[in-house]
């Protein structure tokens, strides 16, 4: 241990270094002057890491004539950061950064942020498994570094240096490579190092952000190294890793990142992804893909999501409605619009679906079943310094709603970086017919920590169980009657009536006892409300391919009936304005005497490869349901919204909410609330309503507004609600990606123009019997 101390005044300097329990580890004194050097050799110390943040306190006292004239103290940590081969290490171990970029921001105070809010930021990060912060793009207030030291966060501290605007003027290196600016560059880094040097959480000094590269950065790096050789130097703008200790990139696509991991490019330096997965609006997708690369290639040592917080300005109107405003809302122009609304945390400090997903993706305890349906599971400890002694597994056997067995596994001792094989058996259960069963495992903290209570969940996993029994029952044979006019076909069974529009070839009504359940039948749609991450696709979709103007055209319709069922066959063509691509559609509706209707839709793609969109937002159907049915229950992935490239945090289950609960309140309204793999959904009032079942599973959205209403709104308060409920059932729904700045949807998660088939059934249900009816299989 050693320290250099600047002094003013006369007297004797006395110092004490105490551990976290207050026990003196070392002490001494020195005569005061302009400066003093103190040092001590400690036989052993408890080291500091983000996982095990242990702090000592150094107290300095100036004494004159036996009395203390001045006293200060600061907390210190012991840790070593160095590069070994193509990885950087903390205390000798290569670590993985699961980080976020952080701006100082408050929706009420702007750049003025309360200390308690800063503390809550760090606590919330820890609770979501985040272990690192890049302060972008300037040093933050001093207190937050204390919180990072205390709770355990790795920090990249960044100099307040950015001259990105020169890039747009095509003279990017104008001042960066001009020696007359050397002092300005060096000064900003030196001030940062001098102020923040004593914080153990800081493992890298960043020379700045997006300022090209030139002689002034070389001088800046020299100055920083002269002051502090114990930390690494970072600067993404050093594209060749000429002066930095790590090779840093931003918004690298998955393919490019994999290439970095597989090669020794850029001097084989450790790689840091200083910005990635731009969290603007609905997203980011592909987080699990990035994490898989980080956990596969040693050289790829993780990165920092852009960014932590949505920068909306809070306003409240005379009615008490809160709106978060962004660029252009005050008549300012030019503007970047809502490009500042790009965080994992919403302006009201609600974790976004993206943050919930990120927490699961970076969970430090990973689990996988070995074999298709066995009892053997692999558990890997992705901590760098902690064993799993402090973790327990809370296990439950469930059908998605009812829990049949619970038990706890609390004997894990897995060492850091090690994989262990566990046997997790379960007892025999009186399985219900036609149900799916799962083993749900929640990974939890045994004891209270500084940042979370005992029992805090780090992550969760779900594994299907093999005990499903399929038992069918014979459908009750009841009469069906068909009546027809010049414009309509009506099919009646009991007191349920299905009406089909013969002019447009569409289900125009489903009624039960005179009450309308469905007001507009399924029609094909390939559109979704624009998401920020599709911003480079939207113009193409809207103005070149007119996907929001898709429509069906009837070719012909036939009706056949027997004593106990009737069938309506409708052949149609789907296309968009002035387009040669589309689908040939065949709807087959089978109506049974018990009042239920099975719907099959077969689509044959009409291709025109030279003049068709690369991919579509979705392929599915849309229906209008009676607006009185606002209670929503479903069996599928949940509880929150999930998409094909953002569903690690979702598990299969039976969930209940209302139509408002199916909406995610993004600052800039956009596609939201989707659920994947939905096997059934009921829309009811307090007593009864509509049940939709799909054995193969569909994607689902339920809202009280149209796609166009969502697309037209600039803020949530501007969304024009309607009486009807809009129900979307999707064959496929494209992923999210993060292409507002970065990776677009991966190829396998783009909905192509291709043949498809989907099926689902509609029926009336009493609310309390919806689940029972949904799991009934008829023959």
Predicted feature locations:
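Extended substrate-binding grooves/exosites of carbohydrate-active enzymes
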Residues: 67-378, 382-389, 394-402
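Extended acidic/polar, glycine-enriched regions
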Residues: 3-84, 430-433, 437-484
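Short proline/glycine- and polar residue-rich coil/turn motifs
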Residues: 29-36, 411-419, 750-753
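Carbohydrate-binding surfaces of carbohydrate-active enzymes
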Residues: 294-505, 599, 769-773
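Beta-strand/loop-rich accessory regions of lumenal/periplasmic or secreted enzymes
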Residues: 49, 425-434, 449, 454, ...
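An acidic-aromatic substrate-binding cleft motif
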Residues: 46, 55, 69-132, 140, ...
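Short edge beta-strand/loop segments characteristic of extracellular beta-sandwich folds
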Residues: 2-8, 376-384, 761
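A short beta-turn/strand-edge loop motif at beta-sheet boundaries
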Residues: 5-12, 383-391, 580, 609-615
């Amino acid at each position: 241990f050693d320290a250099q101390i600047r002094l003013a005044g006369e007297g004797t300097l006395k110092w004490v270094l105490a551990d976290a329990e207050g026990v003196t580890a070392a002490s001494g004194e020195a005569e005061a002057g302009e400066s003093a050097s103190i040092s001590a050799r400690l036989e052993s110390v408890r080291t500091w890491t983000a996982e095990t943040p242990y702090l000592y306190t150094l107290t300095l006292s100036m004494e004159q004539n036996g009395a203390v004239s001045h006293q200060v103290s600061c907390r210190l940590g012991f840790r070593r950061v160095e590069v070994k081969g193509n990885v950087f290490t903390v205390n000798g171990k290569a670590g993985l950064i699961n980080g976020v970029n952080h701006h100082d921001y408050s929706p009420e105070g702007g750049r003025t942020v309360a200390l308690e809010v800063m503390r809550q930021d760090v606590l919330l990060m820890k609770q979501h498994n985040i272990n690192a912060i890049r302060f972008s793009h300037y040093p933050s207030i001093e207190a937050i570094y204390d919180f990072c030291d205390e709770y355990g966060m790795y920090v990249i501290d960044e100099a307040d240096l950015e001259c990105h605007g020169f890039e747009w003027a095509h003279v990017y290196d104008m001042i960066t490579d001009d020696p007359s600016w050397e002092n300005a560059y060096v000064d900003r880094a030196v001030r940062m190092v001098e102020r923040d040097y004593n914080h153990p959480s800081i493992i890298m000094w960043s020379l700045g952000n997006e300022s090209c590269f030139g002689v002034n950065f070389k001088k800046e790096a020299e100055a920083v190294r002269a002051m502090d050789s114990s930390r690494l130097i970072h600067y993404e703008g050093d594209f060749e890793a000429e002066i930095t200790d790590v090779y840093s990139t931003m918004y690298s696509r998955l393919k490019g990142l994999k290439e970095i991991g597989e090669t020794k490019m850029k001097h084989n330096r450790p790689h840091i992804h200083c910005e990635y997965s731009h969290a603007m609006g609905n997203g980011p997708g592909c987080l699990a893909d990035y994490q898989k690369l980080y956990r596969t290639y040693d050289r790829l040592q993780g990165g920092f999501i852009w960014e932590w917080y949505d920068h909306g300005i809070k306003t409240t109107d005379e009615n008490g409605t809160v709106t978060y405003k962004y660029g252009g809302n005050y008549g300012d122009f030019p503007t970047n619009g809502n490009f500042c609304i790009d965080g994992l945390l919403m302006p009201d400090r609600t974790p976004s679906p993206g943050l919930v997903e990120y927490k699961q993706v970076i969970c430090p305890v990973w689990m996988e079943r070995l074999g298709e349906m066995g009892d053997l599971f692999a558990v890997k400890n992705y901590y760098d310094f902690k064993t799993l002694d402090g973790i327990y597994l809370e296990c439950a056997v469930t059908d998605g709603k009812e829990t049949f067995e619970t038990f706890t596994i609390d004997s894990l001792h897995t060492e850091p970086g090690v994989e262990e094989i566990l046997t997790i058996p379960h007892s025999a259960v009186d399985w219900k017919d036609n149900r799916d069963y799962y083993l749900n495992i929640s990974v939890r903290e045994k004891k209270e920590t500084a940042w979370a209570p005992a029992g805090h969940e780090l992550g969760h996993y779900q594994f299907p169980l093999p005990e499903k029994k399929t038992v069918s029952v014979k459908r009750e044979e009841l009469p069906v009657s068909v009546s027809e006019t010049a414009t309509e076909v009506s099919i009646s069974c009991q007191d349920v009536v299905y009406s089909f529009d013969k002019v447009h070839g569409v289900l125009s009504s489903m009624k039960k006892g005179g009450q309308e359940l469905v007001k507009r039948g399924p029609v094909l749609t390939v559109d979704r409300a624009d998401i920020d991450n599709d911003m480079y696709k939207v113009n193409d979709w809207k103005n070149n391919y007119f996907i929001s103007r898709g429509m069906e055209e009837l070719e012909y319709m036939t009706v056949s009936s027997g004593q106990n069922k009737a069938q309506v066959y409708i052949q149609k063509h789907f296309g968009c304005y002035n387009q040669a691509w589309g689908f040939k559609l065949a709807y087959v509706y089978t109506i049974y005497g018990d009042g239920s209707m099975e719907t099959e839709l077969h689509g044959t793609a009409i291709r025109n490869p030279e003049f068709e969109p690369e991919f579509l937002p979705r392929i599915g159907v849309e229906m209008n349901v009676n607006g009185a049915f606002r209670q929503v229950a479903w069996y599928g992935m949940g509880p929150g919204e999930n998409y094909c490239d953002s569903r690690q945090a979702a598990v299969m289950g039976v969930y209940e909410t209302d139509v408002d609960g199916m909406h995610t309140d993004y600052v800039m309204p956009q596609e939201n609330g989707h659920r994947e793999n939905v096997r059934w959904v009921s829309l009811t009032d307090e007593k009864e309503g509509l049940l939709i079942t799909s054995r193969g599973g569909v994607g689902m959205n339920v809202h009280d507004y149209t796609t166009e209403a969502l697309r037209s709104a600039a803020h949530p308060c501007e969304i024009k609600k309607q009486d009807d409920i809009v129900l979307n059932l999707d064959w496929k729904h494209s992923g999210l990606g993060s292409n507002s700045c970065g990776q677009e949807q991966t190829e396998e998660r783009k909905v192509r123009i291709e043949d498809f088939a989907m099926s689902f059934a509609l029926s009336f249900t009493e609310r309390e019997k919806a689940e029972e009816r949904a799991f009934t299989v008829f023959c």
